[in-house]
Amino acid sequence: MAILGLGTDIVEIARIEAVISRSGERLARRVLSDNEWAIWETHQQPVRFLAKRFAVKEAAAKAFGTGIRNGLAFNQFEVFNDELGKPRLRLWGEALILAEKLGVAHMHVTLADERHYACATVILES
């Protein structure tokens, strides 16, 4: 196994809150998958939830070396938790095609949040 990509991102939670205040659900609609949207709608801390998802997806886009462009979209990366609560990534559409093209066999995700920030790191392995 070799490391194919590494990405990290940090998000100021107040920035996400400001965007939601200005534009309502538009950012959440752009960033979240359908499954994540269902969780976001009833989450006790929706701003923090969205900030963490945004950080993971930015980190994943950096790990792939592409950023969010050329057909790649935030909602093609889905963050979910395994049976032990560990964050995982599920890919759709162009993100899945790119992962297959690069030979990605494993994706490692870590995310954390504190009072003002959410951060995430994604490692892609062959």
From Swiss-Prot:
It comes from the Bacteria. One of its GO terms (molecular function) is magnesium ion binding. It catalyses: apo-[ACP] + CoA = holo-[ACP] + adenosine 3',5'-bisphosphate + H(+). SUPFAM superfamilies: 4'-phosphopantetheinyl transferase. It is found in: Cytoplasm. Mg(2+) binds at D9, E58. Its EC number is 2.7.8.7. Its cofactor is Mg(2+). GO terms for cellular component: cytoplasm. The keyword Membrane does not apply. GO terms for biological process: fatty acid biosynthetic process. Keywords: Cytoplasm, Fatty acid biosynthesis, Fatty acid metabolism, Lipid biosynthesis, Lipid metabolism, Magnesium, Metal-binding, Transferase. Belongs to the P-Pant transferase superfamily. AcpS family. Transfers the 4'-phosphopantetheine moiety from coenzyme A to a Ser of acyl-carrier-protein. HAMAP family: AcpS. This is Holo-[acyl-carrier-protein] synthase. It comes from Salmonella newport (strain SL254).
